């Protein structure tokens, strides 16, 4: 119907508000935020819902970090995930030469949610999703000593320029163990070209 120009009606989704406070500690990433969400909400029971992130903690997250979180909304089973369009968004678009496209979008002070989840970014610890479900969340500290045979860094969750610069710093001057395979997939050609220009790509490969 929509392709023919007719209205397409759907049920208004339930809205889960996620209030973020504080700031991420060193070595804690946006991936840990969405893994915490999976620990709280699981992968079941969220169909027909959307997630809206708000709160002072949002201002501390870059656009690539927000993209990591919203991309993994699929693992939650939600219809969509949204962040406000704020000054951080404008700075990102300016850097891409698209500043004229920026529009401020944010929830009003009287916004209401069907459920509110609160996450203190300052208290988050490093997390991992273990087999065989994205909501089988474990603390990294509790996985010490686990044998690793394959490492994949990339997809929509670990492939930004910042992510791969951290990887390059960790791998510089080191060698992958003979019984471990490592694959890296930059999130875009732009990221790949930036890594090549600054020499970080050589540290990775």
Where are these regions (language model features)?
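Fe-S-dependent hydro-lyases/dehydratases of central metabolism
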Residues: 1-205
